Structures are given as structure tokens and as C-alpha cells.
């Protein structure tokens, strides 16, 4: 039973960590409009320590510990697409992940470090966020905004099928979403309040080299 428990946890982690490593932060104001030809370079540091065997944090286990440390670099550029604002984004991650399973008999540890998968994303405004010059944007008052989001994760990260944990997923993933924003009250710098909703769906490709621990 102890051996079977370890296999179940490691199989869960094999799926979990590449998803975490290729994550993009969909935080507040991420999809606000901006002037055309604007370039934005963002850096993040993300660290997690816990005892959950699922990325949702819904299955804590006192026999398990995980540590994730990631550096995230994102580049954004705003374009004019037929009069609509379009934001192209590229995201790269690098860092290390580790997990330890403890039983009354022994402990088993696994770790991995390196580059994560490359994430590319395009967001095209459907209404409410026209393509604007810097001068026009200075007079812009945002109201209701709806956009179409399409993203792709490419299998560029470090991956070996002999490792229980990997920074890369060794498969293509795709995402589609509809970012929506509604300004509440006046558009006054420093006092802006918005309601932001982002429904999205992920589609996962196959990992043809997914043979670690006897998995297919």
C-alpha cells in the first residue's frame, strides 16, 4: 500500500508541475487597453511551499511536501488590428521544483530545475477598446470591454521521461477565453474601480514520451 501511495502521488505531480511552470498571471488590469506600439516588459518571482498533491490545493497530505520557485519573464506589445487593440504576449519561466513523500519507513524526494515551456498569447478586442495613439489614449474613458483571448503553450521546457518532476510538459496546450471588463463609476486615475471576469478553457495535447513510472 505504501508503494502504491507513492506511485499515485508521483503520477499526480508529473501532471501538476508542468502546468504550474507554464502558468501566466491573469491578474487585475492585465487586459486593459493601452496606446498602440506600447512595449511592456514584466518580471515576476513566484514561490510556493505546501503539502497539497493537486494544483487547486484541495487535497492536503501530511506525508507530502512541495516547493516551487519560479522566475517569470513576460513581454507584451500592443498593435492596431483593423481599428481594434490587440495585445501579443510571450512568457518564459525558469526555476526549480521539488517534492518529498514521507512514510514511516523512508522518504522519497524528486526535483527538477531549468526552463519551463514557452507561452504565446494574443488578445484581440471585440468592442470597447479601440486602437489608440498615445494622444488619443490620454482622452480615453474605458467603459465595457470584451476581448477574445487565444494562447498556446509550446513544448520547449526541460523534460526527461525518466524524471518524476519536469519543468516542461512535452506537449502542446491551447487556451481560449473572453476577458470582460466593466468600469464602475468615473474613470479617474487613482480612483478607478472595475469589474473583471475571465472565463477561459484549456485544451491539452498528447505527450508521446510520457513513459516514466510505466505510464503511457
Language-model-derived ranges and their functions:
Residues 27-31, 58-62, 72-78:
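Short secondary-structure capping/turn segments at boundaries of alpha-helices and beta-strands
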Residues 96-210:
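Outer-membrane pore/translocation modules
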Residues 64-100, 188-215:
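Glycine- and aromatic-enriched membrane insertion/assembly motifs of diderm outer-membrane
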Residues 1-32:
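Cleavable N-terminal export/targeting peptides
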Residues 39-41, 88-92, 146-152:
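Short coil-to-beta-strand
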Residues 22, 38, 66-74, 115-119, ...:
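Transmembrane beta-barrel architecture of outer-membrane proteins
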Residues 21-42, 50, 130-144:
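Outer-membrane beta-barrel biogenesis signature
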Residues 48-70, 107-108, 161-166:
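Surface-exposed strand-loop-strand hairpins of Gram-negative outer-membrane beta-barrel proteins
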Amino acid at each position: 500500500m505504501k508503494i502504491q501511495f507513492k506511485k499515485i502521488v508521483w503520477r499526480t505531480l508529473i501532471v501538476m508541475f508542468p502546468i504550474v511552470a507554464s502558468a501566466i498571471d491573469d491578474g487585475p488590469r492585465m487586459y486593459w487597453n493601452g496606446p498602440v506600439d506600447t512595449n511592456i516588459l514584466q518580471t515576476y518571482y513566484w514561490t510556493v511551499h505546501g503539502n497539497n498533491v493537486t494544483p487547486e490545493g484541495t487535497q492536503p497530505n501530511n506525508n507530502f511536501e512541495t516547493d516551487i520557485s519560479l522566475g517569470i519573464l513576460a513581454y507584451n506589445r500592443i498593435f492596431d488590428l483593423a481599428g481594434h487593440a490587440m495585445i501579443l504576449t510571450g512568457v518564459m519561466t525558469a526555476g526549480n521544483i521539488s517534492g518529498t513523500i514521507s512514510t514511516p519507513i523512508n522518504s522519497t524526494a524528486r526535483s527538477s530545475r531549468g526552463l519551463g515551456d514557452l507561452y504565446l498569447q494574443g488578445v484581440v478586442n471585440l468592442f470597447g477598446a479601440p486602437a489608440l495613439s498615445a494622444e488619443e489614449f490620454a482622452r480615453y474613458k474605458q467603459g465595457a470591454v470584451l476581448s477574445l483571448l487565444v494562447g498556446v503553450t509550446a513544448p520547449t521546457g526541460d523534460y526527461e521521461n525518466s524524471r518524476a518532476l519536469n519543468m516542461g510538459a512535452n506537449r502542446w496546450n491551447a487556451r481560449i477565453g473572453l476577458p470582460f471588463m466593466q468600469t464602475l463609476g468615473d474613470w479617474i486615475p487613482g480612483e478607478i474601480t472595475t469589474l473583471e471576469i475571465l472565463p477561459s478553457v484549456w485544451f491539452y495535447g498528447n505527450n508521446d514520451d510520457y513513459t516514466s513510472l510505466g505510464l503511457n
